[in-house]
Curated annotation (Swiss-Prot):
UniProtKB keywords: Ribonucleoprotein, Ribosomal protein, RNA-binding, rRNA-binding
Database matches in Gene3D superfamilies: Ribosomal protein L14
Protein name per UniProt: Large ribosomal subunit protein uL14
Record carries keyword Ribonucleoprotein: yes
One annotated GO biological process: translation
Gene Ontology MF terms: large ribosomal subunit rRNA binding; structural constituent of ribosome
Amino acid sequence: MIQRQTYLNVADNSGAKKVQVIGIPYAPRKYATLGDVVTVTVKEALPQGNAKKGKIYRAIIVRTAKEVRRPDGSYIKFDDNACVLLNQYGEPLGTRVLGPIAREVRNKGFTKIASLAPEVV
């Protein structure tokens, strides 16, 4: 359950460490969940990384601390809120994805991110 002003960890090697959600496009909702695309701004970044502090990117949410109910009745939740930064074409900005990601990301059509992840839960 992600809303505006929420800080997210970045689960790729794009150079950004923490981002803040500034918008939830494509949905007239207040909250975003697993597999949703949000607009973020970089708050912490590594100096040699591709993503620079203050820049605005699109990102897909891959982990949430709030549990999400699946169609089979099970629930999935993670220890943190995390995202993967996207370029203007919807492809991941980094070349690696760190940590597990939710199956909902693959189901929403982001197969490239799912293939880069070490584990799809």
